[in-house]
Amino acid sequence: MTRVRLICVLAATCAVCLPAESVLAQVRAKADVMCRPAGTLQYDCTIVLTNSRTKEPLAGVTLTIGADMPSMPMMHNVRPVKAEPGETPGTYRARLALEMHGDWALQLNLAGPLRDRVLRTLRFDPDRVMPATKAPSHKH
């Protein structure tokens, strides 16, 4: 009888724990990235991370940012830099030193309580940064 109770308790515990884990696994980060020129080929970036479902700020994560040019894969890429937490929860700051102007795909890697990767493609010009324009699609 004791063995049956133990099995029932373990089964109930698993039933309660598994949904919580699956909910945590579904949490995704949303990233708003704003960059501005800070010098020749250097850009100061502010990243605001939120939970994509609840819109709550994601504080306490380790954020690293890498970049590469989608038009020239593996030719131009930037070693990832660690972002520093900003003044408000969920806000992070980093300086990117790029190799040239143009479209860069930023890879935002989150570690800690939430592990995720967010990709954002931006156009870095000498005087401003804006969302990259999408290449025209061709139908054949």
Region annotations inferred by a language model:
Residues S22-H140:
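N-terminal soluble domains immediately following signal/targeting peptides that reside
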Residues I7-P19:
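Bacterial N-terminal signal peptides
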Residues M1-R5:
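Positively charged n-region of N-terminal signal peptides that target proteins for export
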